[in-house]
C-alpha cells in the first residue's frame, strides 16, 4: 500500500508523520515503486501501529527507538523493557506534580483576583515579577500566603 493508504490504516499517523518517522529512523525506509512511490507492507504497518501506540502513551522519540529495538530483539530481557517503562512513569509523575503545583498556584492567585474593573491583579503581578526575575510581590501586596 502507498503512504496515503498506510496513514488511513494507522489512524492518527499522517503521511507527513510517516515520512518524519522514516527520516529520524523510527521506521525503516519504505520500498519504492519504479515511479518512486513509497510502498508499505504488513510489517511496516505493524511497526507504525507500535510507534503510534507508544506515542499515545507519551514515550519520547528516543524511548520509542529503544522500545522498537527491544521489540525486534526476540532475545530481549523484559527487565530492559520494564526499565524504559518505569523511567517514563517517573517522568510522567514529575510532570503531573508540576502541573498540580501550577494548578494550585493559579487557583490561589485567581481566588485573590477581584475580577472586576480594577487594574490590580495578583495573577498579572505574579507573572510580571517572575518575568523580571524578581521574587513575586503578589503575596505581600495582596496578603497571600507563600505559594
Swiss-Prot record:
Highest rank taxon of the organism: Bacteria
Keywords: Copper, Cytoplasm, DNA-binding, Plasmid, Transcription, Transcription regulation
DNA-binding region: 3-22
Domain HTH merR-type span(s) in chain numbering: 1-70
Entries under SMART domains matching the protein: HTH_MERR
GO cellular component terms listed in the entry, alphabetical order: cytoplasm
Keyword Lipid metabolism among UniProt keywords: no
Localization in the cell: Cytoplasm
GO MF annotation terms: copper ion binding; DNA binding; DNA-binding transcription factor activity
A GO BP annotation: positive regulation of DNA-templated transcription
InterPro entries: CueR, DNA-bd_dom_put_sf, MerR-type_HTH_dom, MerR_fam, Tscrpt_reg_MerR_DNA-bd
Domain notes: It contains a N-terminal DNA binding region and a C-terminal metal binding region.
Function: Transcriptional regulator involved in acid tolerance. Binds copper.
Matches recorded under PANTHER family: HEAVY METAL-DEPENDENT TRANSCRIPTIONAL REGULATOR HI_0293-RELATED, REDOX-CYCLING DRUG-SENSING TRANSCRIPTIONAL ACTIVATOR SOXR
Name the record gives this protein: Heavy metal-dependent transcription regulator 1
Species in which this protein is naturally found: Rhizobium meliloti (strain 1021) (Ensifer meliloti)
